[in-house]
């Protein structure tokens, strides 16, 4: 029996101790009419050898591509040490660190993570992670509403990741919170300030500020933050953690800094993995800490005064406060944070800066090369971080298919989420791309454009 | 020692990052970062050494027995880890075209079909990233259902007092009022209270079965009739699905919506607190509202169903499709065990729990529901011991750490005083259970002869008892280099 | 500086402490004329990202094949747990367990290994490994000569792995030990007993007895062992460890059992890896233990009587006895033995039996299928374990090339080592092969034979 | 607890092996096994748990500082492990056709070329699986060379008394008589003794440089002239190559043959005692005798050179091509570091050793060769301390374990009484060295105030001092279930 260690003798002895004649008898409290549990769609068990072969075949089927897709999930080099340590049994198979004395490894690591992440965002405090960037934004919106007390409206630019907006709507709708969207400026790809100013007289709990935004474009974060604060709204930053090594952190935006900064932690050492598991990070100002959802670790001492770590502020949480909890969140993404902490430790401030700077420089170089091709132009005239929108003169979906046939994934179509942006690709070239890769993309795109013209 | 205390300014580890800064930098000056973030500057070796040593300070399934009630701490097969981490799976971008991910999507589709069968539901969405998010999805669908039927007066969710805290917290997050109903002496829901609670305001009932008291709710069919008759829907919290896997299907018990914690029943790793995954299954009537994406199999090709395919969907709950890598691990686990393995899980989990309950009872421990079968877990109450000796459930829990066992769940469910919720899971051997019983006996003896020593536990861990009052009072959440 | 943690300040402080002005000064005892160390063939350093990409490309270049090659290295399923545990830093990066108190993990594991391996071979004791099967056989020959005292000749059947014989000759030649070969019987593929009997009157330190032999054929081990013992020679077994789950172990051969049993440990959880690292195992009778080369672990107690483990019988070894040591061997294959021990623990006696039995059954089935093809016949009429020699009616090298083009590696050519065995393939089908795999081989061989005819 | 003590008869773990026994079995009955081998019957989880826990009882580079002289315990980069274990590399059969292994062979060829450059030799063979096997190959080639020249009267190998035990043991294994020559007060070979030793019987000299005394043999060029003039050849034991990497090439020092320990200088893992790898380099005159296989690159294709290509080869030393996976790790390591990294290794290894020597000297420890630069290692002698207090080098070594440091090499080289051979390696930081110095100071203080406590060390390890006399006297090498 895979994974079940009982011998026949064990079972007999155990049943004797219990005073039952069979294992089946142990289920005698389940009404007979409910016992209809025949499984017809679960195949017979495979040996590890058989499932290994199946999974290798499926992996081979999916193959490897030279990918220029970003749009919220980014290919970065992940040092080998990250996952060799993260998958050690003591991290991989341990439980939530409720028993602090038996969990100092995880607890100290999370405290270190909180320190790194808060500092990276320029904020006072951090929690120990949320599910992903999208749900972290939704939690930030709820948090802003709790803090603001009078408004139940959230102002969200359309330059925020479209799926993040969608997830946020799904989650906040239940609490009758209204999400109001602000259009983007078609020339700059930034929040349309004139459109934003139309809301100047209305009350909002928060303004969401993406940096870089979904188009890769850099927003005027100082002005936006001050705009929010001027009207007593909270400023909620949605940021890419890699970019924070290069870009002014949310805590320094405007006169007072953002109040909450959230984002997708995946770029910090988490593999793309078809979309997950990733992790959401959430940092905020000290005064908001009791409104923050999710687990938080504190440094303290043991009875003898020795430094130690423990879950703290648990009175916010559902397992203590139940219906009065700050959030229903329980499980977080602990193992992903383990990886991210090791990743940040291996890179250090300069290493992370270089990853960011090369991602930026590669995308700049790629855009410069591609712009020279006839039929390619930048969609927006704004500085960008490591993604850019490029408008093609021919049907972009066909172009992408041609690239794919050459082993190149050329980006995502913006039209799916922005109907006005026809034939526009969002492309990304992180530090993983070499000059030859950029040339290859340029060349296959040239061919595809010629073939599609 | 914190990693920051190993740091030294301008120490560099070039091999993990590009060897130089690039020449090109088009970031406008006013948007540039001027401060240096507090990331450590340590060598690769010192990072490896620091985190390897930290890991050794953890208890884990790979090193200790974890009889942690309601958490289903079972063995996480190593093949599930390595096969889910094949390079092609890891490198696949979530927005890569579907035809470059047919291998991955085949696994997801088959997992959906398998989970439908196991739960007896009409459809399954894999998107939920944790049990609590599964609950949120379920209650959101219940709300969507009532709204679609113009039934807007339903403002209450009924929840038994033994439920996990996530249940009431979720109901509130979904804008509902929580109506708590009590448990009777045998550990079942008080049916009279239920009857009194249901009515035109009832949106639904959330139920865990077997309950967190470790017993099977025998009248679940009647509860279903009562709630449905009142126009409410039934939510199944799958936290304890491990106990009835292959024996009863929640769909057959009358539930309309269910989440299942893959990190419990399907043995994906707990990872020190996550990631989890909690696919949601629905009966026919809730099918239109299921969150996207869902995997479809059409003409031999796998594809994502989106909002266009499912116009009534409650929407999306994650940026992509939830914790894909966790789902892969669960898929591999189910394929390893197969149909016959599903039955065995619940059988041996139940056998282990009832055996441990019998043995502890023989030692003199008080069982909270002595007249019931244990499901895959059961409750010991230390109330009498505490009244007599002052030794609490928490003291005993800490003393178990000294003896190399993780503590059971303490002080949950809230309605049993000084309780220990004990769940051994099916992957532990009789010898390990016997060693645990022996340790419990030793502690009983210690309570009799040296109660103060037990109260001061732990003694043999890297740290003595942690001061969590101080942790909350003198908040220290990030390290300050200035001290 | 990759892997070097020194900052400039560190270097300055350290030089001050030393009293040197520069690092270069620390090399001032090296005569200047010797300092010609310019490196011209070592390329500039790569980042981990760059070397990762290079290695992935080279791995992709080598690809995956459906392989029916055995001939001394065997494809078996390796449970995922084996290498996840073996590569834990505490095993992977630890040193030889000379400091016993700081090495109880490795020491206990090796003691467990010795127990498992001795029992598998049916022998009294085991060492903690040697380099590989071939060198283990050479060491066994030296050991036999030391033990025998009067003869410096070793009798080796040609049914022993040809490379093992070659390695043995390279190593023993230095000590003026003569290796005498015994031909095989072309009908049975076994040691030619009549040829062996021609040596009946000569003195030999040992007779080497392979089981299964290089052709996969089972030898008459009882008779061979007794033949050796009857003339006061030692019987040295060379065995496949997987086969020991099914086959009579060397300790039970003949009337008294073999004296020494060695072999290649690779089948016990070690990946094929282009040939290494593998490990050689060596087991022997109790009375030979002091002649055994390599490290040996003993169970003992600490000062307080607590069970513990330590290297023992070190007086045989070079670091103590120097020129009087039993062997010059120092490093062994500790990490491989770690993997093998975990492998044997995961499989247990029944699991290893099934691996062996399915490998045998698959090869039997494959041979039955292939024999039905026109132009294929078994080279030998003898029972075999999990390999068999098949003679083709057409040029076998061309056939192998055709199979390879279909993704199938069809075996090795025996002609390279046995000039008489023209167009003869040695094929192996372990438990990793499914019925479909056997059918695929049969079909591509059918096509290849047709095309070559 | 031994794994066998977790075993229980008829416990089965089907997922790791085929689910049933097959029907076909053509093994003749008299060749079948009847007894059951003593392999444990434990679950996958209990195997994982047992060996995970065992691993935690080890010191290792990933957890502790290992100042182990002559062993070069440096950081083993994790990328070397994972990249050498890519599935295609692992699954490749050694006898698979060369055209299915061009990626692997390219790495091997480039490694040969790199090692040739680093050592200044004419050719390199990668086949040797350990330092001692490298020595065996080297001396066998020396023998082959003399034999090929009809020079059969050369029966002696000269070896300094400071040499590793493998040197004399190897010479004897190769049928030579060992002539040991002494070391002078400064740690150099006694040149007069060398001159007296050489002659028509001299087959060769084996030399480690820098020597195991931690000093560079300054007169190596003269030694080379003396030995060559007498018709002998020079063997370079590369155990300490790390100390001069990129600074001096053994070929330039006049050596004819060299082995280099990849598990030292090129940071392949020690693995608790192996596998190692020790490629052998030769000067032009020994090239014909180099063991096969060797990788050639011809017309853009890589192929093995065999006995056919090299008729004078001494032959083969392993069933295939040695420890291929170890070679891959070394290749990745060299490519990560590059040419500039080779220099840095020796520079910082030397800096660390000289710094540690200076700091320990300041504490009052006696340096064995106080007038010499340390190479990458140096020797402290405890003789005076032992004479005064009775505390031995071994006592100090054990006490270091208590303080979280692996012990230095003790009682080697044999000619220095009560010695500690200390090699910090380049990958350790100044902070770690300073913590080690602080621990050494603590122990010095302890020796002064409580010598008996130090003599009874270790105190804080899982075990107290192991009784190895008993281990050798009451041999217990395999577990007996009967007790």
UniProtKB/Swiss-Prot annotation, chains A, C:
Main enzyme class: oxidoreductase
Signal peptide residues on this chain, from the entry's feature table: none
Gene3D superfamilies reported in the protein's UniProt record: Aspartate Aminotransferase, domain 1 (3.90.1150.10), Type I PLP-dependent aspartate aminotransferase-like (Major domain) (3.40.640.10)
InterPro entries reported in the protein's UniProt record: GcvPA, GDC-P_N, GDC_P, PyrdxlP-dep_Trfase, PyrdxlP-dep_Trfase_major, PyrdxlP-dep_Trfase_small
GO-annotated molecular function: glycine dehydrogenase (decarboxylating) activity
Reactions mediated catalytically: N(6)-[(R)-lipoyl]-L-lysyl-[glycine-cleavage complex H protein] + glycine + H(+) = N(6)-[(R)-S(8)-aminomethyldihydrolipoyl]-L-lysyl-[glycine-cleavage complex H protein] + CO2
Residue ranges crossing the lipid bilayer per the database entry: none
Keyword Oxidoreductase: yes
The UniProt record lists the keyword Oxidoreductase: yes
One GO term of the biological process aspect: nucleoside metabolic process
Protein family per UniProt: Belongs to the GcvP family. N-terminal subunit subfamily.
Subunit relationships: The glycine cleavage system is composed of four proteins: P, T, L and H. In this organism, the P 'protein' is a heterodimer of two subunits.
Role of this protein: The glycine cleavage system catalyzes the degradation of glycine. The P protein binds the alpha-amino group of glycine through its pyridoxal phosphate cofactor; CO(2) is released and the remaining methylamine moiety is then transferred to the lipoamide cofactor of the H protein.
HAMAP family in the cross-refs: GcvPA
Official protein name in the record: Probable glycine dehydrogenase (decarboxylating) subunit 1
Organism the protein comes from: Nitrosomonas europaea (strain ATCC 19718 / CIP 103999 / KCTC 2705 / NBRC 14298)
UniProtKB/Swiss-Prot annotation, chains B, D:
GO CC, alphabetical: cytosol; glycine cleavage complex
Keyword terms of this UniProt record: Oxidoreductase, Pyridoxal phosphate
Catalysed reaction equations from the record: N(6)-[(R)-lipoyl]-L-lysyl-[glycine-cleavage complex H protein] + glycine + H(+) = N(6)-[(R)-S(8)-aminomethyldihydrolipoyl]-L-lysyl-[glycine-cleavage complex H protein] + CO2
GO molecular function: glycine binding; glycine dehydrogenase (decarboxylating) activity; pyridoxal phosphate binding
InterPro entries tied to this protein: Aminotrans_V_dom, GcvPB, GDC-P_C, GDC_P, PyrdxlP-dep_Trfase, PyrdxlP-dep_Trfase_major, PyrdxlP-dep_Trfase_small
Keyword Secreted included in the entry's annotation: no
Sequence segments annotated as region (Disordered): 1-33
Residues recorded as bearing N6-(pyridoxal phosphate)lysine in the entry: 264
Membrane-spanning residues: none
Enzyme kind, highest EC tier: oxidoreductase
A single GO BP: glycine decarboxylation via glycine cleavage system
Cofactor entry: pyridoxal 5'-phosphate
Entry EC number(s): 1.4.4.2
Pfam families: Aminotran_5 (PF00266), GcvP2_C (PF21478)
Presence of the UniProt keyword Phosphoprotein in the record: no
Quaternary state and interactors: The glycine cleavage system is composed of four proteins: P, T, L and H. In this organism, the P 'protein' is a heterodimer of two subunits.
Family the entry assigns: Belongs to the GcvP family. C-terminal subunit subfamily.
Biological role stated in the UniProt entry: The glycine cleavage system catalyzes the degradation of glycine. The P protein binds the alpha-amino group of glycine through its pyridoxal phosphate cofactor; CO(2) is released and the remaining methylamine moiety is then transferred to the lipoamide cofactor of the H protein.
Protein name per UniProt: Probable glycine dehydrogenase (decarboxylating) subunit 2
């Amino acid at each position: 029996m895979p994974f079940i260690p009982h011998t026949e003798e064990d079972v007999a002895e155990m049943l004797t101790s219990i005073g039952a004649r069979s294992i089946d008898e142990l289920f005698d409290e389940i009404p007979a009419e409910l016992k209809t549990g025949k499984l017809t769609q679960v195949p017979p068990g495979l040996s590890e050898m058989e499932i290994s072969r199946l999974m290798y075949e499926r992996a081979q089927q999916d193959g490897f591509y030279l990918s220029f897709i970003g749009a919220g999930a980014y290919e970065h080099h992940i040092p080998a040490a990250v996952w060799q340590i993260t998958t050690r049994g003591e991290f991989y198979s341990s439980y939530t660190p409720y028993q602090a004395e038996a969990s100092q490894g995880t607890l100290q690591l999370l405290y270190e993570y909180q320190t790194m992440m808060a500092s990276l965002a320029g904020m006072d405090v951090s929690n120990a992670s949320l599910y992903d960037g999208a749900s972290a934004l939704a939690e930030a919106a709820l948090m802003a509403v709790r803090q603001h007390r009078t408004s139940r409206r959230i102002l969200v630019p359309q330059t925020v990741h479209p799926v993040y907006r969608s997830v946020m709507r799904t989650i906040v709708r239940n609490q009758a919170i209204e999400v109001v969207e602000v259009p983007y400026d078609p020339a700059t790809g930034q929040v349309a300030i004139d459109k934003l100013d139309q809301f100047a007289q209305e009350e909002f709990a928060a303004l969401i500020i993406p940096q870089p935004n979904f188009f890769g474009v850099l927003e005027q974060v100082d002005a936006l933050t001050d705009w929010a604060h001027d009207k007593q709204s909270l400023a909620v930053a949605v940021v890419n953690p890699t970019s924070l090594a290069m870009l002014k952190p949310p805590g320094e935006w405007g006169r007072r800094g953002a109040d909450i900064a959230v984002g997708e932690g995946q770029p910090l050492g988490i593999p793309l993995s078809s979309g997950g598991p990733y992790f959401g990070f959430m940092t905020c100002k000290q005064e908001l800490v009791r409104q923050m959802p999710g687990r938080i670790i504190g440094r303290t001492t043991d009875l003898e005064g020795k430094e130690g770590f423990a879950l703290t502020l648990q009175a916010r949480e559902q397992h203590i406060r139940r219906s009065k909890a700050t959030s229903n969140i329980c499980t977080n993404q602990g193992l992903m944070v383990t990886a991210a902490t090791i990743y940040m430790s291996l890179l250090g401030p300069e290493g992370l800066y270089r990853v960011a700077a090369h991602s930026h420089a590669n995308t700049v170089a790629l855009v410069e090369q591609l712009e020279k091709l006839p039929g390619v132009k930048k969609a927006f005239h704004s500085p960008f971080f490591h993604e850019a929108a490029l408008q093609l003169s021919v049907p972009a979906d066909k172009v992408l298919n041609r690239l794919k046939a050459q082993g190149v994934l050329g980006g995502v179509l913006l039209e799916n989420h922005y109907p006005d942006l026809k034939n526009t690709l969002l492309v990304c070239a992180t530090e993983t791309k070499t000059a030859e890769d950029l040339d290859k993309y340029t060349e296959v795109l040239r061919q595809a454009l010629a073939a599609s013209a | 020692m914190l990693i920051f205390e190993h740091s030294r300014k301008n120490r560099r580890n070039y091999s993990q990052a590009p060897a130089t800064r690039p020449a090109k930098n088009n970031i406008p000056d006013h948007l540039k970062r001027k401060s240096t973030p507090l990331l450590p500057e340590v060598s690769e070796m010192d990072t490896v050494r620091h985190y390897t040593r930290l890991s050794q300070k953890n208890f884990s399934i790979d090193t200790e027995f974890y009889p942690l009630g309601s958490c289903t701490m079972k063995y996480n097969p190593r093949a599930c880890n390595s096969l889910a981490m094949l390079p092609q799976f890891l490198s696949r971008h979530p927005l890569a075209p579907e035809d470059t991910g047919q291998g991955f999507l085949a696994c997801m589709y088959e997992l959906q079909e398998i989970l439908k069968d196991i739960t007896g539901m009409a459809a399954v969405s894999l998107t939920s990233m944790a049990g609590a998010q599964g609950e949120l999805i379920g209650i959101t669908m219940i709300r969507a259902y009532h709204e679609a039927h113009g039934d807007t007066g339903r403002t209450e969710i009924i929840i038994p007092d033994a439920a996990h805290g996530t249940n009431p917290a979720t109901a509130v997050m979904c804008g509902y009022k929580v109506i708590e109903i009590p448990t009777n002496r045998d550990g079942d829901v008080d049916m009279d209270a239920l009857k009194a609670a249901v009515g035109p305001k009832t949106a639904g009932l959330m139920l865990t079965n077997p309950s967190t008291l470790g017993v099977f709710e025998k009248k679940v069919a009647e509860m279903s009739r009562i709630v449905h008759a009142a126009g409410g829907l039934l939510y199944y919290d799958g936290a304890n699905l491990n106990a009835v896997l292959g024996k009863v299907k929640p769909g057959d018990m009358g539930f309309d919506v269910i989440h299942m914690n893959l990190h419990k029943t399907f043995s994906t790793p707990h990872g020190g607190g996550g990631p989890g995954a909690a696919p949601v299954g629905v009966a026919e009537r809730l099918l239109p509202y299921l969150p996207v994406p869902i995997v479809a199999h059409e003409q031999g090709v796998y594809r994502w169903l989106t909002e266009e395919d499912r116009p009534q969907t409650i929407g999306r709950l994650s940026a992509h499709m939830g914790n894909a890598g966790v789902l892969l691990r669960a898929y591999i686990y189910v394929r390893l065990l197969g149909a016959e393995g599903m039955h065995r899980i619940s059988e041996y989990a139940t056998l282990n729990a009832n055996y441990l309950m019998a043995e502890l009872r023989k030692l003199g421990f008080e069982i909270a529901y002595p007249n019931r079968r244990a499901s895959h877990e059961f409750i010991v109450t230390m109330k009498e011991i505490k009244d007599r000796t002052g030794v609490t459930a928490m003291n005993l829990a800490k003393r178990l750490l000294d003896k190399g066992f993780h503590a059971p769940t303490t002080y949950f469910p809230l309605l049993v005083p000084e309780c220990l919720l004990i769940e051994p899971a099916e992957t532990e051997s009789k010898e390990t259970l016997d060693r645990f019983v022996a340790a419990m006996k030793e502690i009983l003896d210690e309570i009799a002869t040296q109660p103060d020593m037990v109260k001061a536990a732990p003694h043999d861990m890297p740290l003595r008892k942690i001061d969590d009052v101080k942790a909350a009072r003198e908040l220290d959440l990030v390290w300050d280099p200035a001290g």
